[in-house]
């Protein structure tokens, strides 16, 4: 049951990573801010994720730098030294690292995910749980943290600052092209990467529709190599910005794009925060749980067919169930994705503009 909190109750968020998840959490945190504008909010977050969200207004961020090992915990405790316990701690991550952090933080109420959703000793850290519900998408489950603090039902919305410098840099990277498809081909798990030949063919198809194609990626060598391979395979020129952007510049690229295409990755969820159409490529996880929020109608979903072919229909409703196998992405056909692109381009719908301030 929702419980009212005082008008100045202090709230701590524990969600360290990853990019997609912190994008989901941002919508929840900003809903809490709207309902409880006088409640101070502290968010303990990873170093990389902080570069994307660290300028969100009205939130105190404390960086948890996992590269420091135990020193990361000491750094957090040092910054909180002398403070009263938080009134509420929202334990929104269940990894061992984040659960250990939640355990040592002082708070009167420690609220965790619904029973059955946690792992890594999550239940030993929290003294309350978000009530179970029919919610299946990760963001909808996270909304339970807001509801338990008496926040009424809300549609997910984001207001993430993008500076004029970052917007200008993004425009320069794409040579001031106004209509472009942004390819985000990589994923944290290499099994989720679609065939480079398919990406190149998709890029050529987009060119035939009068679009510029931009390929992005992190500075990791694997991403650099993948982007270069796609560019070499394509018959038409692709603007390659892999390894050349900060997360804020990438966010600006997502905002300015006509459409973003890629597998389950942080970039797709960043694009969702900017209300840019997203074509998600899903074979390993259920897009109705991890897909681009507000954009599930444009998902190339082979997951359901693969699950059915393996007689795993019951597991379809199991939260967190994933398939494994490098061959699974081959089930996503180029024709499916080009058809989805046609649908996006024929639609005038782009969700209402979002604030960059």
Predicted feature locations:
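Catalytic machinery of carbohydrate-active enzymes
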Residues: 1-357
């Amino acid at each position: 049951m929702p419980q009212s909190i005082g008008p100045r109750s202090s709230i701590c968020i524990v969600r360290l990573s990853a990019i997609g998840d912190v994008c989901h959490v941002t919508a929840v945190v900003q809903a809490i801010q709207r309902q409880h504008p006088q409640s101070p909010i502290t968010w303990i977050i990873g170093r990389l994720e902080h570069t994307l969200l660290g300028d969100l207004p009205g939130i105190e961020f404390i960086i948890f730098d996992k590269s420091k090992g135990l020193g990361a915990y000491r750094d957090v405790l040092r910054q909180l030294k002398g403070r009263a316990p938080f009134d509420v701690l929202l334990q929104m991550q269940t990894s061992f690292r984040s659960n250990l952090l939640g355990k040592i933080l002082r708070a009167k109420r420690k609220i965790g995910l619904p029973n059955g959703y946690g792992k890594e000793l999550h239940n030993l850290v929290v003294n309350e749980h978000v009530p179970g519900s029919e919610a299946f998408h990760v963001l909808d489950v996270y909304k339970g943290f807001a509801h338990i603090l008496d926040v009424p039902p809300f549609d997910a919305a984001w207001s993430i600052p993008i500076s004029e410098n970052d917007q200008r840099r993004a425009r320069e990277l794409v040579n001031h092209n106004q209509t472009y498809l942004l390819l985000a081909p990589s994923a944290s798990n290499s099994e989720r990467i679609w065939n480079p030949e398919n990406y190149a063919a998709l890029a050529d198809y987009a060119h035939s529709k009068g679009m510029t194609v931009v390929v992005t990626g992190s500075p990791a060598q694997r991403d650099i190599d993948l982007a270069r391979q796609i560019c070499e395979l394509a018959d038409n020129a692709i603007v390659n910005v892999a390894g050349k952007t900060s997360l804020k510049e990438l966010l600006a690229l997502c905002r300015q794009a006509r459409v973003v295409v890629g597998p389950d990755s942080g970039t797709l969820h960043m694009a969702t925060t900017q209300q840019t159409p997203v074509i998600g490529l899903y074979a390993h996880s259920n897009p109705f749980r991890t897909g681009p929020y507000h954009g599930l109608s444009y998902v190339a979903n082979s997951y359901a067919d693969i699950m059915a072919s393996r007689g795993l229909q019951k597991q379809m409703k199991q939260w967190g169930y994933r398939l494994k196998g490098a061959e699974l992405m081959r089930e996503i056909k180029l024709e499916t994705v080009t058809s989805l692109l046609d649908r996006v381009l024929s639609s005038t719908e782009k969700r209402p503009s979002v604030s960059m301030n």
